[in-house]
């Protein structure tokens, strides 16, 4: 499978959103990155999470092309995926071309606007553990 290549964003407040394909827990994660203009007020959920270590990485199928994402993002997407309908998400590690310094700088400057425009923001703390249960068991 060929490696995913980012296509450039328009300079006027365009962002990428991940259209995460519906699926069961047994199915591999897949989706596509779509370009939208923030000023057109698309309905999406923003994802905030700790990126964690850059290695190891997990496979992600983006527009039928290969992409690798961090374990924390993979875990978050697996838990946010719906069984019967696609989900529109923004996650910086995936929706911003991290290898394009100019784009990354421009998109980081827009992050407060992106989070403000989101229908909801999900904060991913990681997989459930006994420590998490204890923290929320007050």
What feature does the model see in each segment?
Residues 1-90, 96-106, 127-138:
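Metal-dependent phosphate/diphosphate-handling catalytic cores characterized by acidic Asp/Glu clusters
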